[in-house]
Amino acid sequence: MNDRATVTHLLQRLTAHLRVVYPDHDCEMLAERIVNLFWPDTSQMIKRRKIADKHLWDESDIVLITYGGSVRSKKERPLRTLHRFLKAHIGQTIGAVHILPFFPYSCDDGFGVIDYLEVDENLGEWSDIESIAEDYRLMADLVINHGSSKSKWFQQFLSDEAPGKDYYFTADPATDLGQVVRPRSHPLLTPFRTASGDRYVWSTFSTDQLDFDFSNPEVLIEFVKILAAYIDHGVRIFRLDAIAFLWKKIGTPSINLDETHEIIRLLRTLFDHHVETLIIITETNIPNHENLTYFGNQNEAHVIYNFSLPPLLTHALLTGNALYLKRLTRSNPPALAGCTYLNFTASHDGIGLRPTEGALPQGEVDQMLAAIQTFGGRVSMRRGPGGIEKPYEMNISYFEAMQGTLDGPDEYQVDRFMAAMAIMLALEGIPAIYIHSLLATANGYEEVNLTGHNRSINRRQLDYDRISEQLADASTVEAE
């Protein structure tokens, strides 16, 4: 049991976080609400805050990144097929599974969430998620920056009804927003006709993904409820999606703001007082020196993505020049106790180019882009300062990205691909392997044509029986 002193100390810590973010609100009351929502059963609260240490992971930890529907069978819903695939072909080789958003959604293959507390019925149900969590450490996304225009909250916004009417960040279209850092090229504000008139909603990623207004503490309260529910269903590792964009402030770049870091610290305080071992991973696809700030003082993320690795590793293997990759490995400081890097070559997104800023000369970037396009890849753009479009990411299957050099395709694709994976596995940190890298999947041109989105090239859905046959045949690339 937990004594009152434990709760009092926790309330004081939470109140301190909240006062930084919400100085004009009753932060003591907010802290009490958060504790009651996060710990409806106080037996799940530990008496003393966990001390950051190195016992959260070890050299055997590997994460598999997959969609709930990446492997399919006509016999059952996809989450059950995924679990069957894991047991048959992965076993205990990989200890953690990151299932990308498995909620009802309207866009972006899951990242436009309609209902945070339900499993997409086309994938399965909560019992399927819980079954996977019994066999593997489960990682899931908290899509915290934005939600779907089809959600109940946004429909309330359109109708000017509580609580959703105050959940979204809006701005006057006449406002100068030129300082805002953009990951996309569409207009930042999306107009909507609401019951109270025309309003312009901040939409960092698409017109169907509307940004929440965290200056309203009720939005934070909602996500505390969501976190508590995910923990109950077996999630232990939380990927904070697009977290760098969380707090918006007119007249600033609206990225990496102090309030964003403080909210992460608040979540870390909650996690550090929970009886379960809970891990925060921040998804911040930004230049490396900015990315490193998300460790905080061992009081923010436990793990940050090594976003600089995929583009610099790709560049090294396509050019034969490892200078820039070596600079990265030498410049990344050894992680402090309780912190580490998530190393990867590819994910469900493209190979990001923002981390190359200041790390790779533009001429080298241009050569790499040309090679990737030769290998069938695509290049997605973002809108930079002054409205100038810049390359944002390379969209390609990582196996296809390794098919040659700047001079074109050659016979060393498999060797080059295996070298990339070996380098990634050898670096300090936790390795993460995307399912389409594990299975050496080819570019999905049909998927791109179907969706109209470049990222679909590396988000194919595979037939369970076919992939099982390929893995059983030692002569196939998949088996290699």
Identify the function of each model-found stretch.
Residues 2-480:
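Active-site and adjacent substrate-binding regions of carbohydrate-active enzymes
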